[in-house]
Curated annotation (Swiss-Prot):
Belongs to the V-ATPase H subunit family. This is Probable V-type proton ATPase subunit H 1. The lineage of its organism: Eukaryota, Metazoa, Ecdysozoa, Nematoda, Chromadorea. Subunit of the V1 complex of vacuolar(H+)-ATPase (V-ATPase), a multisubunit enzyme composed of a peripheral complex (V1) that hydrolyzes ATP and a membrane integral complex (V0) that translocates protons. V-ATPase is responsible for acidifying and maintaining the pH of intracellular compartments and in some cell types, is targeted to the plasma membrane, where it is responsible for acidifying the extracellular environment. Subunit H is essential for V-ATPase activity, but not for the assembly of the complex. One of its GO terms (cellular component) is vacuolar proton-transporting V-type ATPase, V1 domain. It comes from Caenorhabditis briggsae. GO terms for molecular function: proton-transporting ATPase activity, rotational mechanism. InterPro entries: ARM-like, ARM-type_fold, ATPase_V1-cplx_hsu, ATPase_V1-cplx_hsu_C, ATPase_V1-cplx_hsu_C_sf. The gene is vha-18. V-ATPase is a heteromultimeric enzyme made up of two complexes: the ATP-hydrolytic V1 complex and the proton translocation V0 complex. The V1 complex consists of three catalytic AB heterodimers that form a heterohexamer, three peripheral stalks each consisting of EG heterodimers, one central rotor including subunits D and F, and the regulatory subunits C and H. The proton translocation complex V0 consists of the proton transport subunit a, a ring of proteolipid subunits c9c'', rotary subunit d, subunits e and f, and the accessory subunits vah-19/Ac45 and vah-20/PRR. Keywords: Hydrogen ion transport, Ion transport, Transport. The keyword Metal-binding does not apply.
Length: 451
């Protein structure tokens, strides 16, 4: 997959607004006469407006040199009217889009003034006008990526924090696609990835993915593209495992019919395994994917006739890695380790028919040691997840072990389940009820209790 894919974007609200701004009729003479801007500022902006071709504009910039930068800065800072600030920023954004090497004119003046080139624009990010804010994002992005000077330190933190705030405003913000587009460009550079991840950036992207779920697949693709770019950094790939990223994109994998969305989800999942240098974290990533039914979804995707070589390769990679994990997770040793640590969660064994068929009797080994542990968890644990899983396992033991019902009742398991039927948590009540039903009937399959 190539970085250039982020150029194929929908026409955003921002772009439509920019078209209107470019048609604005300016009256720079008014501000010159009132001495809000200098004559040199007036001379430059009028001359630049009259330039009709790219070559003409390059000539104007080479003639005015640093005066061009001073003029731009004065037009943004000395004139308070939003429409003129909008217009000036649009001129600058268009100028850089036409030739990104023009970022150097801001860098050269910044060096002379002993300040950062980004400082000319960062103050505009607090403005209320969202067009001004997002045009500033666009300008800063071009400078931060294509310029020779990279944004760092407090300036980088402020820039990334502003972008994060922009995408967490959600669907009500018509400019969200513009902020995401900037991220698609910024996250090519590793320090920018780290900075964004360190301010809970994944959570904001997940929020944006949810808030724009009814806005079409293109914005969905762009947001996941940002996630994919972040996972090229090992630290970022590790941080992703602490949140709900895998759960979020696995849901999309199971519902999206767009090949490009499926492709970027698979590429992101692959990176979460491949980019993690720590073997333990690789296994954790694969475990989360198994728990979120990625392997099942990959099996379903195999029925589709994909032509994309990268997509097919990513599917094969994930299937191979996840099957390794399933083999380990469905081993009784892994289950026993989970049980002894008291950290029950929905790992594959708990819902695997083959696992219980082959291993249910082992809960009776060593004077029913493991079965007693499960019942103790039902009696003493305050963790709803542990209670749900323990109740499930008691039910599966009864279901697959001929004398399971008798052993559970003798150890007080039935009473423990009955007490759980009155707890506040609805999930705990649900799994306790299922287990209690299995204690009371003989034909388990008639219950239709596939969970």
């Amino acid at each position: 997959m190539v970085f250039g894919e982020n150029q194929d974007l929908i026409r955003t609200h921002f772009q439509k607004e920019a078209d209107k701004v470019r048609q604005m009729k300016t009256n720079w003479g008014l501000f010159t006469r009132s001495r809000m801007i200098a004559q040199s500022d007036y001379d430059f902006v009028v001359t630049y407006e009259q330039a009709e071709t790219e070559q003409d504009r390059s000539t104007v910039l080479s003639v005015f040199k640093e005066k061009a930068v001073y003029a731009f800065v004065h037009l943004m800072s000395q004139i308070s009217k939003d429409d003129y600030v909008r217009y000036t920023l649009t001129i600058i954004d268009d100028m850089l889009r036409e030739d990104v090497s023009r970022t150097k004119i801001f860098e050269e003046v910044a060096v002379l003034l002993k300040r950062s080139p980004f400082s000319f624009f960062l103050g505009l990010l607090h403005r209320q006008d969202q067009y001004i804010v997002h045009t500033t994002f666009s300008v800063l992005t071009k400078m931060a990526v294509f310029g020779n000077i990279k944004v760092t330190g407090d300036e980088l933190d402020y820039f990334m924090g502003s972008l994060k705030e922009a995408i967490t405003r959600g669907i009500a913000n018509d400019y969200i696609a513009t902020a995401v587009r900037c991220m698609q460009t910024l996250f090519r550079i590793d320090p920018y990835r780290v900075s964004f991840v360190n301010i809970s950036g994944y959570e904001s992207l997940s929020h944006a993915l949810y808030s724009t779920r009814k806005c079409g697949f293109q914005i969905q693709y762009q947001i996941i593209f940002c996630m994919w770019l972040l996972t090229f950094n090992g630290h970022a790939a590790e941080v992703a495992l602490c949140g709900n990223l895998i759960q979020t994109i696995s849901t999309i994998l199971g519902t999206s019919h767009k090949e490009k969305v499926i492709r970027i989800v698979l590429a992101t999942l692959r990176n979460l395994i491949a980019s993690n240098e720590d073997e333990y974290m690789k296994k954790q990533a694969a475990r989360q994917m198994v728990q979120n039914q990625i392997l099942v979804k990959l099996d379903h995707l195999e029925n589709r006739k994909f032509q994309d070589v990268d997509l097919i390769d990513d599917m094969a990679f994930l299937q191979k890695e996840l099957k390794k994990v399933v083999e380990v997770l469905t081993s009784f040793e892994e289950y026993e380790s989970e049980l002894r640590h008291g950290a029950l969660f929905w790992s594959p064994p708990h819902k695997c028919e083959i696992f219980w068929t082959e291993n249910a009797h082992k809960l009776n080994d060593n004077r029913q040691e493991l079965l007693k542990m499960l019942i103790t968890m039902l009696e003493k644990s305050n963790d709803p997840l542990v209670l749900c899983v323990a109740a499930n396992d008691i039910g599966e033991f009864v279901r697959y072990y001929p004398r399971g019902k008798m052993h559970v009742e003798q150890l007080g398991g039935k009473e423990a389940l009955m007490r759980l039927l009155t707890v506040p948590d609805p999930n705990v009540r649900y799994f306790a009820l299922l287990a209690a039903q299995k204690l009371m009937v003989n034909h388990w399959k008639d219950l239709g209790l596939e969970i």
